[in-house]
Amino acid sequence: MLAKFGLCAVFLVLGTAATFDTDPEEASPRRARFSSNSPSDVARCLNGALAVGCGTFACLENSTCDTDGMHDICQLFFHTAATFNTQGKTFVKESLRCIANGVTSKVFQTIRRCGVFQRMISEVQEECYSRLDICGVARSNPEAIGEVVQVPAHFPNRYYSTLLQSLLACDEETVAVVRAGLVARLGPDMETLFQLLQNKHCPQGSNQGPNSAPAGWRWPMGSPPSFKIQPSMRGRDPTHLFARKRSVEALEREME
């Protein structure tokens, strides 16, 4: 999906949490400190969950497989559903049902390996968004989709990244809508980021690393930033850039 844009730097920022696969066996001791639901617990929960509402996605929370995130996205869609038009309301209901049914139907095939299970959820999510025309919904509901795409609270989330990537794979008009919404919330820093992402293409066979920058670009601090990869929402450094949860009002005050 990202090939359409040639977004080299997306692995530096947008994709760090979404595309970084930690080895399940290596990561399990660290996760055990804040996770309680084993894969079998998750499977049993999904098997008994209703396909409406956010119950299915609640089963994915607090899992040793680090599958948090879809429940927050589900709640965001439900909380903003009233601001969508008729097409948007249908999309909210059907996309959440589609993802819930897809995940539940494939859970027993993938639950044994955390990496496979995580990817399956993302693939189902992406397929449902595409099938139900998320691009058309975003074009006709720019304000509502902007409320859903709240970057500061959801950056370290692989399923938020799948949502954002699905929107960025749309036509230029829709991408412009999403971009404008993000820039309005995050200010000039996000504008600079988008310029880097959309102007720098990744040539095939390139040996450039994720910290490479376009010709002529100078990093503000003299060297590329180093981002700490934190796969889970829990146990994060509260002072970390992507861990800060700031409201829209706080952002607006900072931008004044």
UniProtKB/Swiss-Prot annotation:
It is found in: Secreted. Residues 204-241 are annotated as: Disordered. Residues 19-33 form a propeptide. Coiled coil: none annotated. Residues 1-18 form the signal peptide. Glycans are attached at N62. Belongs to the stanniocalcin family. PANTHER family: STANNIOCALCIN. Homodimer; disulfide-linked. This is Stanniocalcin. The lineage of its organism: Eukaryota, Metazoa, Chordata, Craniata, Vertebrata. The gene is stc.
